[in-house]
């Protein structure tokens, strides 16, 4: 085509050259445009991929009694330790401590010692409203407690205790959360033998329930017992008041919880 155009008069040749030059410029601009579009698309794709690769922040609720709640004399309860350990491991997380002292699993209508909201009363607000990925359930000490001494009824009967925990587990699962059941921690020798015997029934029930409901389990009796056998002070060193774990006990529990979450979060 170019040869045919150049056979004409000089004026036409000039016009032809201008046309060819303009076409060349337009072609160059078009190529630059395509290159720019490709670059933008690549950036968008890389950004999308990068966002997809970012780890989701886990929401963890620790639901329980005074062995979960912040407590005077404890530097870091296990909820705090969980957050720190997961953060250090590169797992974004938010830990909500929903432990309340003297709580049992039931309602204040079931047993009003003390007259506060108990597990069933506050479950919706304290747990489900946070849409948790993980929930730890740590009850039993107050449920099993016999206010009138040896041979008398527990605050929450064993069957009701199991039913309450089952309700918590079912509702958490319905809301796409995962459950870690903790047995109540053991008692030290400061507490009467009959209290150990009654609490053991509740501990055994938690172990059985975790198996039947296919949820994670931390056997605090086993964890604390192993530590007590290897360290001076034994169980009394873990729980000076006979009931509530000090910082070492909270660290033991936190380590077990973190181990489970890290394993399941891969």
Features from the language model and the residues they span:
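Catalytic His-Asp segment of secreted/periplasmic serine-dependent ester chemistry enzymes
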Residues: 184-266
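N-terminal secretory targeting modules
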Residues: 1-63, 67-76, 80-93, 128-131, ...
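Amphipathic, non-transmembrane alpha-helical secondary structure
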Residues: 120-128, 159-166, 170, 251, ...
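Conserved SGNH/GDSL esterase-like catalytic core that processes O-acyl groups on lipids
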Residues: 55-62, 67-163
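Sec-exported extracytoplasmic/periplasmic mature domains
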Residues: 87-88, 128, 132, 140, ...
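Active-site segments of SGNH/GDSL-like serine hydrolases
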Residues: 138-145, 168-201
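Charged, glycine-enriched surface loops/patches
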Residues: 153-182, 205-215
